[in-house]
Amino acid sequence: MLEIFSKKRRQKGFTLIELLVVIAIIGILATIVLVSLNTARQKARDVRRLSDIRQLALALEMYYDDTNYYVKNISTCPSISTNLGVLVPTYMGALPSDPGSNDYYYGSDANGQDYVLRAILENAVPAGSYTSGTATYGCVCVAASKEYCIRP
């Protein structure tokens, strides 16, 4: 009978510390994955914004080819829905909308010979976009503020 008590019993299973370490590692990995996923989503929305602005620019160029002027502004750098509705359906199927909570903006000179399209990005503005420290047709385009603008 003493032999039964004196032998070490081999325990099956994991200790509490081992379980806590594994749970902590899983938590850290999950956090890293979620942060990476959020960054990827932001970049995807920005790519969509850049594409939408380029599509608007193409539609404006087709409009210019037909009329010899770009769509003239009604007010200072309004949302595209204010005065670019004339592009639908002849030059594009529908006006694009920002995938987030912002909007796209359009400003033009009084004669319709120049314009600026503006979108607000979530990440840094790509190289080659138009930037100015002052308002261009009412649209302020500052790269530090993540404002992406293009002109013809």
Question: What spans do the regions from the language model cover?
Answer:
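N-terminal leader/signal peptides at the extreme start of proteins
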Residues: M1-F14
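Residues within membrane-spanning alpha-helices of integral membrane proteins
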Residues: A24-I25, D52
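Short, surface-exposed interaction loops/tails
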Residues: N111-P152
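N-terminal export/targeting and maturation segments
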Residues: K8-R9, L50, E61, D66
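Extracellular/periplasmic head regions of type IV pilus-like filament subunits
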Residues: L58-N123
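N-terminal signal-anchor/signal peptide hydrophobic helix marking the start
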Residues: F14-A24
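C-terminal juxtamembrane segment of a hydrophobic transmembrane alpha-helix
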Residues: I26-R45, Y64
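Juxtamembrane membrane-water interface segments immediately C-terminal to a transmembrane helix
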Residues: K43, V47-R54
